[in-house]
């Protein structure tokens, strides 16, 4: 009984940590057409993207990839692991290039020092997403 209550509280806290995440992500192509590129978080806050980051990102991708890449790129932090996961073939391509690693397909695992490098280059293009596995 006690475990059920603490599990529910943990899930609620994780939900609260993720309230900043957008209810709808936009493609890089869409954002480049906006005067003030942004997405709206589920909590109603606006997350603005810096032009320099969007242009830097655009230079790394083909036209087709710019049409398909949805932003922000999520850095998935899980409760049971020490690193983070980034999913999606285009997202992995970007992260691999920034970190000077081989492209690993459709997901990549990174650790704290690599997160700092990624966030230093793309602070507005990336966002943390907190996950908790079934307890």
UniProtKB/Swiss-Prot annotation:
Alphabetical list of NCBIfam families matching this protein: PRK04115.1
Pfam families in the record: DUF61 (PF01886)
Family: Belongs to the UPF0216 family.
Cystine pairs: none
Protein name per UniProt: UPF0216 protein MTH_949
Cited InterPro entries: UPF0216 (IPR002746)
Species whose genome carries this gene: Methanothermobacter thermautotrophicus (strain ATCC 29096 / DSM 1053 / JCM 10044 / NBRC 100330 / Delta H) (Methanobacterium thermoautotrophicum)
Coiled-coil region: none
